């Protein structure tokens, strides 16, 4: 192995530490471990499985939207929530979120929002901490993460969240309700990450395949709320993983709220010289 190859490997490992540290900072750290379709619906909900598998395409048709995210998990007997907000372009598969970690247990240090840039196969983070200068970005290859970055970054990429539904195996239409004042159809079901990976677009195949093998189970229960155009307005996934400290799987609930479709999205990826290449501290 050449010196340059060793340096690239060291940088990838350091970036993975930085990403994993988001969950560690909230009290958890993710680590990898190692049918037939059933359709339930009615004349109002239609073919639930087919409808849900088309939801990602409906977002591409919409072009873009604003997004709010939340990730809930139990840490040391206390439930904590990581929140985020931003915009996403479903055609370019790029977005930007401001992610806020919960306050530290002592309640003394105020946490600065972490800026995350989402791109195919990559996650960029600024204000990450862990010894990274405030004006530098950390780049993470999401294909190297055992969870496919479904939870490690503290927020699920909105388009990846939608493509999880490509793996829908069972689904039930539960009726109409409202999300943020919009009439929606509520579906509840289970998706398989392996199935989702096989049907996903090129940028999500690798991450979803990694998640299928990295979570405690590849089956993901969900609640999805679709508007009359078939676009996701709200989706809640329940992931399960082993974090290396707990004997039993840790449950993480990731919720994504989408609104203001057609919103302007401008994402500029960092220049090479703005990406941190030094050592990243473990938390």
Predicted regions: what is each one?
Residues 2-10, 26-29, 33-283:
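Subset-of-secretome marker
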Residues 11-23:
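Sec-dependent N-terminal signal peptides
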């Amino acid at each position: 192995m050449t010196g340059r190859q060793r340096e690239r490997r060291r940088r990838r490992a350091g970036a993975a530490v930085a990403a994993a540290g988001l969950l560690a900072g909230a009290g958890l750290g993710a680590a990898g471990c190692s049918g037939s379709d059933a359709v339930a619906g009615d004349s109002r909900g239609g073919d639930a499985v087919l409808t849900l598998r088309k939801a990602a395409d409906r977002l591409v048709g919409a072009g873009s939207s604003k997004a709010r995210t939340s990730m809930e998990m139990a840490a040391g007997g206390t439930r904590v929530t990581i929140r985020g907000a931003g915009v996403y372009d479903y055609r370019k598969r790029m977005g930007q979120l401001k992610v806020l970690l919960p306050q530290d247990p002592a309640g003394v240090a105020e946490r600065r929002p972490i800026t995350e840039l989402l791109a195919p196969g990559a996650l960029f983070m600024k204000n990450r901490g862990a010894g990274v200068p405030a004006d530098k970005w950390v780049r993470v290859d999401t294909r190297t993460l055992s969870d496919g970055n479904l939870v490690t970054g503290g927020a699920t990429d909105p388009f990846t969240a939608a493509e999880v539904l490509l793996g829908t195996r069972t689904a039930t239409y539960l009726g109409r309700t409202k999300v943020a004042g919009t009439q929606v159809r509520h579906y509840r079901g289970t998706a398989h990450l392996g199935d989702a990976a096989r049907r996903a677009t090129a940028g999500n195949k690798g991450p979803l395949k990694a998640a299928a093998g990295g979570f405690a189970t590849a089956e993901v229960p969900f609640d999805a709320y679709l508007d009359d155009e078939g676009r996701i307005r709200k989706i809640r996934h329940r992931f399960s993983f082993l974090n290396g400290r707990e004997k039993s799987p840790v449950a993480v609930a990731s919720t994504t709220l989408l609104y203001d479709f057609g919103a302007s999205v401008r994402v500029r990826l960092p220049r090479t010289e703005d990406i941190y290449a030094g050592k990243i501290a473990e938390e």
